Amino acid sequence: MQYMILRKADASTEAGELPGPALLAAMGAYNEELAKAGMLLGGEGLQASSKGALIRFSGGKPTVTDGPFTEAKELIAGFTMVEAASRQELMEWLQRWPKEDADGNTSLEVREGGCPGGVRGVAAKGAPALPEGFRRFMILLKANDRTEAGIVPDSEWLGRMAQHNDEAARAGVLLMGEGLKPSASAFRMKFTRGKPGVMDGPFAEAKELLAGFWVIQARSLQAAVDWALGYPFPFRETEEVEVEIRLLYEAADFAAA
């Protein structure tokens, strides 16, 4: 079963502070173990929301706001996609999350992958060789009451989403993407001084949750926003829908620090 591990943002990540050598080494070793176990599917770090943008659709009309997202209570600083035989297996792995991360005071949210409407995801194909001047951006579809209830658009709309994904992937724009099941099957793991505590879903704050994501390459934040404005997100014509656009870290960002 596929899962998405969401590493919640904190004051340090929102300030744009880069992880130190100890954390980079610890996370690298942890991910290497996941890969050796055949579980690691991909993962990325997100830059501070000040380098992103937020789109709000209301009655089909979009409003774009530049970051930072000061109103949001729950932001994402990174994610890891894994394949696990069971929830219990994954929980055992997560209990070994590197204590170097936030001095052992990290918050994780684990979501079951897979679009409830059956739209096929786009799997990552390793680190892409980005064209000169391009960056990668993550498009985060926020949940709402409909997605949390497992309500999906009609087959025609789902077909539009699938076609858009296929065309963007063939064009080399869409690098990765997946829907997420409602939070009823999710859990959170909060570490306090390295000791984990677990809370099962569902989680009440629907607008702070994710319903799906896409990773694209674009020349600029504006180009990424334009791509998102053209995407047929579920219920964008009839409901209040929010989409975050976040800049991803590249290896060069750490080398330049």
Each predicted region: which residue ranges?
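Conserved, structured core segments of small domains
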Residues: 1-257
